[in-house]
Amino acid sequence: MASTPRTPAPERSPPPVPTPPPPLEDEPPPYLADGSPREEASFSSDGREGAPPKNPQLSPTHHAAPRLVPPPSSPARQDGQEQEGSANKAAAATAEPAREPLRQMATGLARPLSSQTSPATTNSPTPSASPTPSSPAPVANNSKRSGQSTPKRAETKLPLSSPAVAVHFDPVEEAVTSPLRLGKARLDQQQQQQHAAGAAESGASVVPGVAAAVAAVAERRELLLALRLATAVLSLAAFSVIASARTSGWAGDYYARHLQYRYAVAVNVIVFAYSVAQSLGKIRHLVSPRFTFRTMSSYYCSLFLDQVLAYLLMSASSAAASRNDLWVSRFGTDAFVRKITGALWLSFVAFLVLALNAVISXANLFSMV
């Protein structure tokens, strides 16, 4: 199988080589514009003494990140970089300084962007970053104001609190001079004045509620005294007749032999003593004006005792009446049975009068309440 001949490559002209512009005669080389003292001593004004010509000035290299640092270069290249850096510094010094933007580093501190050197422009042979210049320590901000350039709104000054004053607390004085008590007394006084003004306009006398209740109780005091005395007299007559009832002879009888009669005598004695005590109290209220007012406990006690003694007197009279009826059904009627029957009638009447006393006591209690 025959081989196919290859087509020769087309002939191309070589790329043009750029030629640098000729340097001016009266302008010194750029790398000698602002050199180090050693370089100034080595070279003359025309730049032809003692050493070969330097490399032309190169533009600065910008890297994407500090970690992408090129490997260390040769000494000749390092010398060129030093000359390039010195030339850049001289050009920056001769040119008009421009305002550089400030970057906030800390509260109250600002540093220009030029102070932060990039690791790519340093002459260190290692890829480590160059140390930043030492910055002054931040000053303690005692005025509690921000380091920003924008002014803040003036702080409002709060008034100083007055010091606490210790006051002795007297519970008795507080109870007497309490605003609640003073306010209640003032309200009662205003109400009394309003009632008095209304009575003067209408021409009728207005009596406070407590005075009206006391007046109502006083009106029933004579009736209650009469009922107390009647109860005492009836109970006295009842237990006296029962105690005096007896017969002589072999068929004679006596009240102490029967439990029901003894129970009726005991209850009548208690009712008599209670009625006498209540009658003395009513007489004292009628005679002496100092004892016009009574406490609420006395009204409650009177109502309670009236009801309890009325129930006891009713039960005792009923028990004695049942025993007397049994005696009559067995042995007939005689003088002893007739006396017991009369005494039991007096005991029942005393019960009715004592029940009326209980009703009046309840009326007096609810009048005061």
UniProtKB/Swiss-Prot annotation:
Localization terms from the record: Cell membrane
InterPro entries: CASP_dom
Ranges of the Extracellular topological domain: 244-262, 322-339
Predominant place of localization: membrane
Listed Pro residues bias regions: 7-23
Transmembrane segments: 223-243, 263-283, 301-321, 340-360
Basic and acidic residues bias spans: 36-51
Topological domain ranges for the Cytoplasmic compartment: 1-222, 284-300, 361-369
Region of interest (Disordered), ranges: 1-162
One term under GO cellular component: plasma membrane
Keywords linked to the UniProt accession: Cell membrane, Membrane, Transmembrane, Transmembrane helix
Signal peptide: none
Topology relative to the membrane: Multi-pass membrane protein
Compositionally biased intervals (Low complexity): 87-96, 114-127
Quaternary assembly: Homodimer and heterodimers.
Family per record: Belongs to the Casparian strip membrane proteins (CASP) family.
UniProt protein name: CASP-like protein 4U1
Species: Zea mays
